[in-house]
């Protein structure tokens, strides 16, 4: 999580809407995902008391580890060391069997969409490449498409959604 600026940046705007305009924000989110009026329950962040901004974004799929076997499956699919996914907001929309997971990644401009994979060949890169290969095959994407550069963060979110769909979450 970057330090939050005074009135600028994607995270600042997301927090403003979630904190000061929650009803309208929830309405727009529920409308955007095709569930108008459905209730949304946003998860709280953890605390990081030793940081300049004392909140810690939810990381990876830690908020789902209460599901039997999910942590082991996730660790087999994706590296869980440094550089793991950080979510700007996580919530559940709907009730009961119709409940669906919401994962938010706020972006204030197109430049924020650009990123490269920082994983090393001796670290998590082989697992990431294997996950991308599986997802590309499933989606019918070109095998040679480069998902490790330029829009890596978007690609790793697509891989995460593929994993969650496969696990019926």
Protein language model features and the residues they cover:
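Acidic, metal/cofactor-coordinating or nucleic-acid-engaging core segments within structured domains
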Residues: 117-169
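Extracellular structured ligand-interaction cores
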Residues: 84-88, 101-103, 149-151
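Hydrophobic, Leu/Ile/Phe/Ala-enriched alpha-helical segments that form helix-helix packing faces
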Residues: 18, 29, 33, 91-93, ...
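Conserved catalytic cores of phosphodiester-cleaving nucleases, focusing on short active-site segments
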Residues: 89-91, 100-108, 157
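A structured, charge-rich N-terminal accessory region that forms the first stable segment of a protein
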Residues: 1-65
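Short catalytic/ligand-binding loop motif for oxyanion handling, primarily in non-cytosolic enzymes
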Residues: 98, 110-114, 166
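Short beta-strand-loop-alpha-helix junction that forms the active-site gateway
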Residues: 106-121
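Active-site metal-binding core of divalent-cation-utilizing nuclease and nuclease-like domains
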Residues: 56-97
């Amino acid at each position: 999580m970057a330090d939050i600026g005074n009135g600028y940046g994607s995270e600042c705007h997301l927090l403003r809407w979630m904190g000061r305009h929650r009803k309208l924000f929830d309405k727009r989110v529920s409308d955007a995902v095709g569930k108008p009026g459905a209730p949304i329950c946003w998860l709280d962040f953890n605390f990081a008391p030793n940081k300049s901004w004392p909140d810690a974004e939810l990381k990876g799929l830690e908020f789902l580890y209460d599901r039997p076997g999910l942590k082991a499956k996730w660790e087999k699919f994706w590296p869980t060391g440094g550089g793991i996914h950080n979510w700007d907001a996580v919530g559940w929309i709907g009730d009961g069997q119709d409940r669906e997971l919401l994962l938010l990644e706020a972006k204030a401009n197109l430049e924020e969409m650009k990123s490269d994979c920082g994983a090393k060949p001796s670290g998590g890169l082989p697992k990431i490449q294997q996950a991308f290969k599986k997802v590309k095959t499933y989606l019918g994407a070109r095998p040679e498409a480069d998902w490790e550069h330029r829009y890596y963060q978007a690609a790793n979110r697509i891989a995460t959604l593929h994993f969650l769909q496969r696990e019926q979450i």
